[in-house]
Amino acid sequence: MKRLLPFLTELDAWVTELKPLKQMTLDSRQVDEGDLFVALKGHQVDGRRFIQKAIEQGAALVLAEADEGQDEIELDAKFAKYNLDRTACKVVLVPNLARILSEIAGAFYANPSEKLTLVGVTGTNGKTTSAQLLAQWHNLLGGKSAVMGTIGNGLYGKVQEAANTTGSAIEVQRNLADFVEMGADFCAMEVSSHGLAQYRAEALSYDLAVFTNLSRDHLDYHKTMEEYAQAKFRLFSELDTKAQVLNADDEVGREWLAKLPDAVAVSTDASFSSEHKFVKATDVSFSLQGVKIAFESSWGNGELNSRLIGAFNVNNLLTALAGLLVLGHDLPKLIETAPLLQGVAGRMECVVSQKNPQNRPLVLVDYAHTPDALEKALQAARLHTEGELYCIFGCGGDRDAGKRPMMAAIAEELADKVIATDDNPRTEDNAKIMADILNGFVQVEKVQVIHDREQAIKTAIEQANEKDVILIAGKGHEDYQIIGTTKHHFSDQETAAKYL
């Protein structure tokens, strides 16, 4: 409780009388005896509706977000009886609670970000791969890494599934505290635009902030690209970051580099020059075995050999290399361990036939679910294609509909054969989603529409030969499909392996 006093004594003097609190939560269903319940207004659900339930379940303290005007007065009156009874739960109205919650949670969990090396990775695409590569590489060099992000949270290789890329302000601080307790000395954390806009990754001590790229996504939330970019930039301009690594091949990255003179620039362009510290590729060659990257940097020159697939992984590898160099790792050891790096589940992941691998197409599963990511995935797959390139994709329901025709146009341009299928339709009519997708094709008659995702994958594998490549885009590591409000088990990898 003492750790909370700097934040709460000014709000209410009686806080000093409270017994030590056990846990901190935003979910009233998780409240146990002696816990601290935080009631935020929320974007969809007002958590203050559940204050009574939290109190009944044994909450020792409630922090409720204060509104302006009548609502605050009503809340104050409603819970005055609890605050008059010194033996009962206390309810404190806190102005701007959402904005300062990360700081309160940090104090509650003894500021765990100060006890390990924390790397925050943001960008539309490449967050997961870059974060996973950073953590994996750190482990190869003798460290003990944890990760937080799209694939899950936990020690590297032992993650638990997470609901959001960036959890709540409380979850982020609690996870970091757990990692410290488990002995982690490093954490690579994906920082989403939602998390930044909602102050969920706020009161953290970042040893390094990484920017991968910016392209269209989440405009159902941010409304404009400018608002989306500004949310991302907060990690570099407003939060506590000791060093920054930015992608200089990205237009927004170049704009931000001009504002951040001490940042490190990463480029895959051999002609790139800058006054910043840098890591750049000077020559890149692809093969069925992976990629070979000759590079120059402010730390020295060398060559990376990796089993990863695709041109965009060149940038991911160089980004991870730059980040670890900034953090003080030895360049020769990084080069030596690079061939041991493995790809990330659902990120250009190869599915190999266990029956007859020599006579089957190469099947790649990738999480690409934005126009930019699909373009990069198809370009990457083309580098390894001797015959025809198939693209199987769909678009999620109840999400940005504007990207659907854009993704269709990209698939038509870059693939030889396209099968449009269902992704996660959620509560939206899959026929409406498909109509939006088909609006993006010039020659609709050449597109196969197969709503059933398993049947779409089966059809492509039956049609393709051993020189062809099949890209199954959109779901990546996910092992479910959301139809209506229900999650059904479905894995692109399992389905492809079944028919190979």
UniProtKB/Swiss-Prot annotation:
GO CC entries: cytoplasm
Keywords tagged on the record: ATP-binding, Cell cycle, Cell division, Cell shape, Cell wall biogenesis/degradation, Cytoplasm, Ligase, Magnesium, Nucleotide-binding, Peptidoglycan synthesis
Q: Which residues pair up as cystines? A: none
By sequence similarity, the record places it as follows: Belongs to the MurCDEF family. MurE subfamily.
Q: Which Pfam families match?
A: Mur_ligase (PF01225), Mur_ligase_C (PF02875), Mur_ligase_M (PF08245)
- The residues that hold meso-2,6-diaminopimelate are 399, 423-426, 474, 478
Gene name?
A: murE
* Cofactor section: Mg(2+)
What's the name of the protein?
UDP-N-acetylmuramoyl-L-alanyl-D-glutamate--2,6-diaminopimelate ligase
Gene3D superfamilies under this entry?
Mur ligase, C-terminal domain, Mur-like, catalytic domain, MurE/MurF, N-terminal domain
Q: Where in the cell is it found?
A: Cytoplasm
Please tell me whether the keyword Calcium is annotated for this protein. Answer: no
The pathway this protein participates in, as annotated, is: Cell wall biogenesis; peptidoglycan biosynthesis
Q: Which residues carry this modification: N6-carboxylysine?
A: 232
> Where along the sequence does the record place the motif called Meso-diaminopimelate recognition motif?
423-426
Q: What is its main location?
A: cytoplasm
EC? 6.3.2.13
Please name the top-level EC class of this enzyme. ligase
Task: Offer one example of a GO biological process linked to this entry.
Answer: regulation of cell shape
Q: Where does UDP-N-acetyl-alpha-D-muramoyl-L-alanyl-D-glutamate bind?
A: 26, 28, 43-45, 164-166, 192, 198, 200
* Reactions catalysed according to its record: UDP-N-acetyl-alpha-D-muramoyl-L-alanyl-D-glutamate + meso-2,6-diaminopimelate + ATP = UDP-N-acetyl-alpha-D-muramoyl-L-alanyl-gamma-D-glutamyl-meso-2,6-diaminopimelate + ADP + phosphate + H(+)
Q: How is it modified after translation?
A: Carboxylation is probably crucial for Mg(2+) binding and, consequently, for the gamma-phosphate positioning of ATP.
| PANTHER family registered for this protein in UniProt | MUR LIGASE FAMILY MEMBER, UDP-N-ACETYLMURAMOYL-L-ALANYL-D-GLUTAMATE--2,6-DIAMINOPIMELATE LIGASE MURE HOMOLOG, CHLOROPLASTIC
Q: Where ATP is bound, by residue?
A: 123-129
